[in-house]
């Protein structure tokens, strides 16, 4: 490809040089001749004694007439087949009276004279050839529309192995068998095992689906074809199906190999009913994929690995056994997974001795593998910005805030009242989160603007959580409302800074009622049905499957939950107004507080939730002490103890 480019550029430069030479020859040769003169004028000047000499060039019909006492030179062009001596005699001039000199023609002069006529012709021919080559390239591009755009990674490239993938141990075990099959297919054929046609990797963005598929190819040492689902379909009809055929033809020629289709939901969506009579190019591409995956020979060692974060919209024919035999789920890593991922991404990076990766993993719940990689990279950039040779705790923990909330905006100037209002707002969040047993502990509070936020309060669970209880949701609602309540109690008005808190609280309360069945009034029912439109994809619209009366009751339950959270937050802040002022004052002074600084303001320990159930279901840290436990108490469910410092509020 590069050689053709150099040839094409060289051809263009050659044409330009030839054109420049032609222009130069034309102007220079024309300039040397000077003004022209007729034969009558020359004869008159000779008779008048003005001409010093006549200069002739052999083989040329031009004569240079040089005048006495001046540098003027005029050019006479002889008629065809006319001799200068005969011409002078015709005008009655003796040739002996004139100094006539004859010079041999220069070889370069002949060449330049020839080029004067030849170069324009060569230039036109070159332009025509160049245009023909361009047209030929355009035709080739048009014919290559049906070719696959897959990128091929072979064994001579830097490989990714399972050692570079962490936090997805179960997925690696599932895919280890794929590696075994690609390496030793006869081992499975001897037992009559069927070749696995495809593996579907399902998981949220950033969980390592693409990385894991490349690790499979790296472990097996086979070619790896990578293509995105959106690269199949173009503006021309039939291009998608043609590219699918070409992709699988290449894969068969390079077997054993792996074909990786990223974001397969771009072409693998469930086929519709064909409403409107339109021809859906995407459906034809999907049909071709189904045919190709079902048309493999049993001896063809080609495995298709696809990745998607929307498995619910895929066509059932694509998911049946015989096409994608296995579905491997990749979820966000837990504490141990995050620790393993951090060890992989910090490999080869100079860390300071005080860096605790386990503590870092504990402070990043919900982070995906891509988030953790970005965190380590941001920390390295911060260290380089500060001209450090190593990455320390300060950079890593600051990188967490950058990933979660965005970079700091310390240059933004705000008034003292707005700064104080932000401090009380965030102090309200922190205080209510600290006093509620079922709320997550406060980790960090800051009034430094980050991203689009004027301040933020970070709470972290004590352990990984996969389920939420009603009490935890109610505590979270109270924490959401605490900022607004703090502004109202201190300043007797509320600001727009609580808009996002209100939106999140309303959304959570509505989901508690309509999705999670956490309403005592409406019971464990799910309200609202997802409308599956056949030609637009799934979950486009939500249809009400309940009456207006039920809709009114849903709104009332949402209002009741929000009001209850509001009253809970208000009671806590009223009972601990001194702590609210201390936290706000420290925030104005330091701008950022961690959980230990907030905990130091309290004399009593943080309230712990009282869990009901068999002791084996309770975390060790939350089991009641022998002084408070009653061995003879029954194990059936008991009413939960009231939240400390909160007066019971009647339901509205």
Curated annotation (Swiss-Prot):
Membrane topology, as annotated, equals: Multi-pass membrane protein
Q: Give, as one word, the top-level EC class.
A: hydrolase
- Listed binding positions for Zn(2+) are 425, 429, 501
CDD domains, per database record: RecA-like_FtsH
| Record flagged with keyword rRNA-binding | no
**What are the required cofactors?**
Zn(2+)
- Topological domains on the Extracellular side lie at 31-110
Give start-end positions of Pro residues composition bias. Answer: 641-652
Q: Where is the active site?
A: 426
Q: What is its main location?
A: membrane
Residues annotated to bind ATP: 203-210
Residue ranges for the region (Disordered) are 623-652
Q: Name one GO cellular component term.
A: plasma membrane
Function text: Acts as a processive, ATP-dependent zinc metallopeptidase for both cytoplasmic and membrane proteins. Plays a role in the quality control of integral membrane proteins.
Family named by the database record = In the central section; belongs to the AAA ATPase family.
Q: How does it assemble?
A: Homohexamer.
**Any idea what this protein is called?**
ATP-dependent zinc metalloprotease FtsH 1
